[in-house]
Regions:
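Acidic, Ser/Pro/Thr-rich low-complexity regulatory regions
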Residues: 1-113
């Protein structure tokens, strides 16, 4: 119960950050997808949340952290171009889905109560 409340709050924060553009779209979508899987797998499969799954799957082969730094510049640029294309294609839908999570799918924040 406590963990679910914490996960819901983390999801609300991530969705807000994605909407406020405080977080890169791809990173935000991946984080939301992973948290949704832990919070409520059924909600994660909801059609309104599919964009997060799509962005996760489209980028899961991309190296992260030290492996990213180890890539040569042309490889990094190729991945960055892919990110830009994905962002253009999915930004509006990801923003709508984040707004839906905040307004309808997730319990209201304790602060708002």
């Amino acid at each position: 119960e406590k963990q679910q409340t914490a996960l819901a709050e983390d999801l609300r924060i991530l969705a807000s950050c994605l909407l406020d553009e405080q977080l890169p779209l791809i990173e935000g979508a991946i984080r939301i997808k992973v948290l949704l899987d832990n919070y409520d797998a059924e909600l994660g499969q909801h059609p309104r949340c599919q964009v997060f799954q799509q962005l996760f799957e489209a980028t899961e082969q991309v190296p992260t952290h030290a492996a990213w730094k180890a890539l040569d510049k042309s490889e990094r640029r190729r991945h960055e171009a892919q990110f830009s294309a994905l962002e253009l294609r999915h930004k509006a839908e990801a923003r709508r889905s984040a707004r839906w999570l905040l307004d309808e799918a997730l319990p209201k924040s304790r602060d708002a109560a």
